[in-house]
Amino acid sequence: MLHGMSGKIRGGQGVTQGAALKRVLVIKHGALGDMVQGFDAFAGLRAGLPDAHLALLTTPPFLDLASRMPWVDEVLCDRRAPVVNLAELWRMRGIFRAGWDAVIDLQCSRRTAQYHRRFAPASTRWFGTAAGASDPYPDFSGVNNADRMRIGIEMAGGDRHVTAGLDWLDNGAAGPDGDLPGATVLVPGCSAAKPQKRWPADRFAAIATAEMETGRKVAIVGTAADREAADAIMNATPGCVDLVGRTGLGELAALFRHAGAVIGNDTGPTFLAARVGTPTLMLMGADTDPSMSAPVGARAGWLREDRISEIASDDALAALDRLRSG
């Protein structure tokens, strides 16, 4: 059965609006999918606090993306150094003691809880899940990650009903090969740490074959880490356009914006495709909880089996067609 985003928010009752906050530090380390799911929250925070100085604390892979976001005034780097790196810990202490009215923790990790315990002044409001936070989040069980972040910024005075504009993301960038208008884009990669999230390459090849038989172009995207999966698909269906390693984030957004459909694993580019509004199907295994991690988009859906290899290519094709026709 094809599933879409339910939109149901649990535990979001009783949140309190923030006072007039002037200096706000937002924490979001990544990964790419989480950053994409946070776009609406970032935009909503800016809408609710138009005159505030908003800073985003993120990790090195996302500094460039963060610096291009139109909603933040300052981007700060968290290298997530080990605790034995005293110089880096001292630098982080300085960041948290830079006169913030509030810290909005959208990462909610053990590391950020330690930042609250070690570095945050008592006078700084802390929105998050850390023990002792002045503004604790409600129970987020079963709540989509995008909705969690919207609720978090609403508690600090943001507007969680804002939908972020994304024209800045590609900013007129041309996707590779003329954007491949109407193409079906395959996203066969995933985190190297979780190879079990990969749908088998032969299933992607079956999708490619079926799509090309209808006259559609098919492209494959990913990074160098996805080369093996991409090569397996290319060997089976050499008519695909191989864009692995050829797309930055802007080019990827442009490609997706002009594509006919996208099908991929639980990985950042699939979230991006869903968010720009392209018909997007995410394939999930036991490692993905769709109540938390389903892609957000007007024409996004997902299929899930405990063993991702049990998702049949025919079922995926049928689901993709329903998203296209919807």
Model features per residue range: what roles?
Residues 1-326:
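Catalytic machinery of carbohydrate-active enzymes
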